[in-house]
């Protein structure tokens, strides 16, 4: 039974982020819709859940904090109910210089939230009795479940389709190193900020001039995975 299928590699692009206060959400949305790029809502808002994997050295965090020119993050992503992961997507998020892209792998997995640990928390979608070790589908350098991050995403796109924008809010972080069992209950909420991200091909960067002025948008580094693991940073400082 093929548990991982349909590999997709996304185009390389710029991903520019800025953190705003939650009370600015309505204003941000209005400015996007009224901008010269005439953004429009293109997809229903939804909750995104990402289970991040790393290693005992926390190398993905170290690369991000140090600003390494080449980075990789490994995560399983699904949408909607936190404990209802069916056919999650395995994502390798890659970055080289200023450009980011993903390797996406469809899976035929279903989460068993009552499992005694993450490594055997998934079964085959078509056969509940077919348990597997999640390490079997993960890259060998990122096999330890570290953090479960959830947030609510709003989707927008410019009128010509050349720029995508997302606004993320209601972030929550669940440390998966606290216990052997999957941790869905103990969480740290962050409802004080929203994250605006602009996604575009490098050749379209010139289109942002007026938009970034109106949005008071100065790109800054922000990683949800890094934010989720701040309590562990003493381990590599």
Task: Place the predicted regions along the sequence by residue.
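Phosphate-end processing signature that detects enzymes handling 5′-triphosphorylated RNA
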Residues: 1-237
């Amino acid at each position: 039974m093929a548990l991982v299928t349909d590999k997709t590699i996304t185009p390389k692009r710029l991903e520019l982020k800025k953190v705003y206060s939650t009370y600015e959400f309505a204003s941000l949305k209005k400015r996007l819709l009224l901008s010269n790029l005439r953004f429009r809502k293109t997809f229903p808002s939804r909750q995104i859940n990402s289970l991040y994997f790393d290693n005992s050295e926390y190398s993905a965090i170290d690369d991000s904090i140090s600003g390494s020119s080449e980075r990789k993050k490994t995560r399983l992503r699904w949408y909607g109910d936190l404990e209802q992961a069916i056919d999650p997507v395995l994502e390798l998020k890659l970055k080289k210089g200023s450009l980011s892209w993903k390797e996406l792998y469809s899976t035929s997995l279903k989460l068993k939230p009552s499992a005694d640990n993450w490594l055997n928390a998934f079964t085959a979608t078509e056969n509940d009795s077919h348990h597997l070790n999640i390490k079997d589908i993960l890259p060998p350098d990122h096999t330890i479940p570290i953090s479960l991050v959830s947030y609510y995403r709003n989707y927008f796109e410019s009128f010509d389709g050349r720029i995508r924008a997302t606004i993320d809010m209601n972030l929550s972080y669940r440390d998966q190193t606290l216990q052997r069992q999957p941790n869905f209950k103990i969480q740290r909420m962050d409802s004080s900020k929203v994250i605006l991200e602009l996604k575009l091909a490098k050749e379209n960067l010139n289109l942002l001039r007026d938009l970034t002025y109106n949005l008071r948008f100065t790109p800054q580094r922000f990683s949800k995975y890094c934010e989720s693991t701040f309590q562990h940073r003493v381990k590599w400082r």
